[in-house]
């Protein structure tokens, strides 16, 4: 399937592989076949970039991979929410204009820029709410939505954040196993 639209993938060549990030400890993750078979694509240079940004922000790489899996199925060009949510991390541009400006991001369809905005936002939510579980709820619902629809009703654990957290643990184990090989 990847070969039918080769031009679509040139976006991964828009960034120099020399971003000065700390790659120590990086292990290539092989996305599950169910995703690659349906158009998911997470090439090594994108993974290395994501890993470096995660290290820079102090956010778990396995968490971000699990979040990308849940949000977009590794489809860097996915558009959701009636055309509002874009890319790997399904960023809602209207909600992140200030963040995009601060990060010099102009194009959420660019996977590198998309992941940078997503990790920056996730990092902020983890810092604000103190747990990955609550940060994921706020990522999914928006902060006001999480407060009104979940937390006000005593809901802290639900399908979205539990799926991501269990996948995070599985991905962590897979990466540790691959690092040991």
Give the label of every model feature segment.
Residues 1-2:
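Gram-positive cell-envelope targeting signals
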Residues 5-17:
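Short acidic-hydrophobic catalytic motif
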Residues 15-181:
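Catalytic glycan-binding domains that act on GlcNAc-containing polysaccharides
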């Amino acid at each position: 399937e990847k070969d039918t639209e080769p031009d679509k993938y040139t976006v991964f060549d828009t960034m120099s592989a020399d971003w000065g990030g700390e790659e120590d400890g990086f292990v290539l993750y092989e996305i599950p076949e169910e995703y690659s078979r349906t158009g998911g694509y997470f090439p090594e240079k994108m993974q290395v970039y994501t890993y470096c940004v995660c290290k820079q922000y102090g956010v778990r790489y396995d968490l971000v991979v699990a979040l990308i899996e849940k949000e977009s199925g590794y489809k860097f060009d996915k558009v959701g929410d009636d055309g509002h949510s874009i890319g790997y991390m399904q960023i809602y541009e209207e909600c992140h204009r200030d963040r995009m400006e601060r990060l010099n991001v102009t194009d959420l369809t660019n996977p590198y820029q998309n992941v940078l905005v997503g990790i920056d936002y996730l990092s902020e939510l983890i810092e604000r709410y103190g747990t990955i579980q609550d940060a994921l709820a706020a990522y999914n619902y928006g902060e006001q939505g999480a407060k009104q629809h979940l937390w006000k009703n005593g809901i802290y654990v639900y399908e979205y954040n539990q799926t991501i957290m269990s996948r995070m643990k599985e991905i962590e184990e897979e990466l540790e196993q691959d690092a040991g090989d």
